[in-house]
Amino acid sequence: MLLATAVSPVSRLLAAAATATVTATLVLLLAGVGLVTGAAAVGGDGPGVVDVLVGAVSQLPATLAVAAIVYAAYGFGSRWIAVGWAAVVLDLLLGPLGTLIGAPQWLRDTAPHTHLPADVGAPVPLTAAFILIVVATALLTTGSWALRRRDLV
């Protein structure tokens, strides 16, 4: 029904990207609330609510960078979707699970989530977060440009 109206593919995909951004933010915030609630339920004396929420939301630039890779891959064509899925899987394997699988540091550094600390209360490197946001914006722009040039039929 939506595609029967005069909606451009770029605006439709940008709406999906905005939805992904809001959803990722909510999931990260709810994960932080869950951590605080779980710690309070067992009587733990951990970091404060603000520290946990900042730690959770600090992962947002890396998450958006991975989502932007998927967006750009789709913009270039449906055959490129495998590149987007590879980015998601490699980010998971090399980011949070990189030390567990014994990946070398140079390889783990290719995953966006390795550049932001997952530890609650750790200082957030603003330079890395800013660079990831710039990369995500550049990938969104590239994906939108590619989608405009693409024949969707």
Q: Language-model features: where?
A:
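Membrane-interfacial segments
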Residues: G38-G46, G77, I81, A146, ...
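Secretory targeting signals
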Residues: A18-Y71
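Alpha-helical transmembrane segments of integral membrane proteins
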Residues: A15, T19, V50, V54, ...
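A structural motif at transmembrane helix-loop-helix junctions in multipass membrane proteins
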Residues: S58-L93
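Hydrophobic alpha-helical transmembrane segments
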Residues: M1-P9, A31-G34, G75-V88
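Alpha-helical membrane-inserting segments
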Residues: L30, G34, G38, I69, ...
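Terminal transmembrane helical anchor/hairpin motif
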Residues: V83-V153
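Helix-loop-helix units of permease transmembrane domains in multi-pass membrane transporters
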Residues: M1-T23
